Every structure is written in C-alpha cells, then in structure tokens.
Regions:
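C-terminal segment of classical bacterial N-terminal signal peptides
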Residues: 12-20
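Non-globular, low-confidence helical/coil segments that flank catalytic cores
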Residues: 2, 7, 19-370
Length: 370
C-alpha cells in the first residue's frame, strides 16, 4: 500500500515539475498548509528563496503531508527549500521530514539544538534527521539570530528555551497584559524549546512561534513587549491556547490557526480572539469540534472539511473526555486538502485566500503603532 502511495505522489509531483518553475513574484507569499493538526508553513520570498517552517506528521500521515507541502511548493514556483526550520521535535512538526526530503532538495536545516524529550517514537525520527543535515548545512538557532533571506528581515526571537532580550526596533513598551498572568507549573517539554520567528517584509510583519508555551510567551513579552506589532499572526500552539499577553499587544489585523478537527479552537481560546482589539478575522484550517457553532468563525474562513462531510456542524462545543480517559479518534480527512495563501506587499497590504472556496480578503496598509 505504501509503495502505491509513493508512486502516486511521485506521479503527481515529479522532480521535473517541482523544479522546472521559477518564482517571479514581487510579493512575499505564505502558504499555511493543512497537515491535520500539525504544522507546515512555506514562505516564498520575491528573491526566489524559500523558508519552510516544519514538515507535518510522520507515520501513516507522512506521505499525505509531504504531498500537501509539495503542492504548495509547486504553486509557489520555488526550486528547493533554502532554509528549513524545525521548531521543535514533536512528530506533528518534524515527522514528515524524511518523506519530504526524498522529493525536494533542502539546503539548510535550522533547529533549537538537542532534544529534551527523548522517546521511542521520536528517537528514530531524529536519527534520520541527523543523517539528513549531515549532508547539508546545520544551524542551531539562538534568539537574536538572523536568517539570510533576500528582501526579508527574518529574526529568531525564541529558541532552546531562551527568548530575545533586546527589543526589536520600535518595540519595548510596557505590556499591560502581564500583570494578570499566572505561570503554569509544569515540567518543560519540547514545546518550551520552540524556535520562534519574526518576519518583516517592507512594512509587513508576521510571526510564527511553533508551540511556544505560555510560560515562554511571558518571558518574551513581559514586562515589556519586545516585538511590537504584527499584521498577521500565524498562531502558536495550533490555537489550543491563546494568551492576552501575546495576542493583544501584537495587535494583528488577521490571524491564521493551523488546527485540526479536534485540535485547537476550544471556547476559552476563541473568546480571546473575539475580544482582541483590532483583530478583524481568524482563518481556521479546519472547523473545530472543540468550538462547535457556538464559538466558531464563519464558514468562508474555514479551509477544510472531512472525507465524509457533515450536514451540519454541532452547535455545542465537544465536551472533553473524563479525566484520565483518551479521546476517541478524530474524524478522518485524508482526501483533498486546501491551504491558505497569503500574499503580502512591501507597503503592508496583504491578501489571504481560502483555496477551498476561492474567498479572499485584502487588508489594506495602515499606519500602526506598537
């Protein structure tokens, strides 16, 4: 079965097609890709260079997710992945790498350093990862580092459990949302180690923080906001938890949630969105059973449905399972997948397009204070 799937993937995305196209746009194009509650985001710069942040799921989902990433690569017209950032070593962020690397060259591998959460499921993945970066360039990112991408200012603001100490230009004002924060008393995980990036293209600004935890978000944003504001927030943690101390001072005009059908979008997280000052829209990769109709966004802002579409979305949010009991398997979505495409201009204007229904919305450039 796997050989059949591999054949189909190669048939749809042959190397000659993947590398024949050359990028010729004057926009920064961002592809937020559906990897079923994992993460994969492709940045295609006007220079022709590309940055991929994470590679989706491993295991049975690896071929599926690699194919979805390659579809975005083809649309972007990039010839290789110049910089691959692995935010952290969880299977939904790095699992698809080995499969992807068989179909497209990857020039540089960027990560946070040593794994702090070894285990039987992730150790073989990291062994294969080490074999890949041994053949290319490997960089351990530190807060304050810059990734050289023509036309972009790409700053690392978090990595390896550390955060940026010096505010970005124009940032550094006191953050009024810090006072009410209560630290979460939990052991550190790979999420705490996440590589976080702040990207500037002319006057357009966006951020992607992987699964950076609330405690590390506090370290980054308090007592002073070291980042300033953004136009687009590519949400951390799949939209599972959204903190006022991060979202509110960033003051995004739009946000994209790379969630799954039962991952991201619980009521408390959605309430933070809906009360966020200046946030016009939230775009969701999937409708979320965790939010139900009660807390969801309009359907035109949702990219993906299920293999067996529902006649209606439940009104009430899905109740969590009893403590100590696992949730039942999530509904399947292994068929056609749609992504969000963002096209940003140097003046700060950007357009988000839902490729499922063709709906797009343009957010005009505007003067923004921190």
């Amino acid at each position: 079965m796997r050989m059949t799937m591999l054949f189909l993937l190669v048939a749809v995305f042959p190397a000659s097609v993947a590398f024949a196209q050359t990028r010729s746009a004057n926009t920064l194009d961002i592809y937020v890709i559906d990897v079923e509650g994992g993460n994969a985001v492709l940045f295609a710069a006007p220079s022709g260079e590309s940055v991929l942040v994470d590679t989706g799921n491993g295991g049975d989902g690896a071929v599926r997710d690699a194919g979805r990433i390659l579809a975005a690569v083809k649309d972007a017209g990039v010839q290789r992945i110049d910089h691959l950032i692995i935010t952290h070593y969880h299977n939904d962020h790095i699992g698809g790498l080995s499969e992807l690397a068989t179909h497209i060259p990857i020039k540089e591998f960027i990560d946070h350093g040593a794994n702090i959460q070894p285990g039987a499921n992730i150790d073989p993945v990291l062994e294969r990862y080490a074999g890949l970066y041994a053949k290319g360039k490997h960089t351990v990112a530190k807060p304050g580092d810059k990734i050289p991408v023509g036309g972009l200012d790409w700053r690392i603001v978090a990595s390896g459990g550390e955060v940026l100490k010096t505010p970005l230009p124009g940032a550094g004002r006191p953050n009024p949302y810090c006072a009410s924060f209560k630290a979460v008393d939990v052991a550190k995980t790979e999420d705490d180690e996440s590589v976080g990036s702040f990207i500037t293209f002319g006057k357009f600004r966006t951020i992607i923080l992987g699964d950076l935890t609330l405690n590390r978000q506090f370290d980054l944003m308090c007592p002073n906001n070291r980042l300033g504001s953004v136009d687009l927030d590519i949400l951390a943690r799949h939209g599972n938890v959204n903190s006022e101390l991060l979202l509110y001072p960033l003051h995004p005009r739009a946000a994209i949630m790379n969630n799954g059908t039962r991952k991201g979008g619980p009521p408390e997280a959605m309430k933070v969105f809906f009360s966020s000052p200046g946030l016009a829209d939230v775009w969701q990769m999937h409708f979320s059973l965790l939010s139900g109709q009660e807390y969801t966004v309009p359907g035109m802002f949702i990219a993906n449905l299920l293999d067996q579409p529902q006649t209606a979305m439940p009104v009430a949010p899905l109740a969590p399972p009893p403590q100590g009991q696992p949730a039942p398997p999530a509904p399947q979505h292994n068929g056609t997948a749609y992504y969000f495409k963002v096209s940003a201009q140097p003046d700060g204007t950007f357009t988000v397009t839902n490729t499922r229904n063709g709906f797009s919305k343009t957010y005009k450039a505007s003067a923004k204070a921190e």
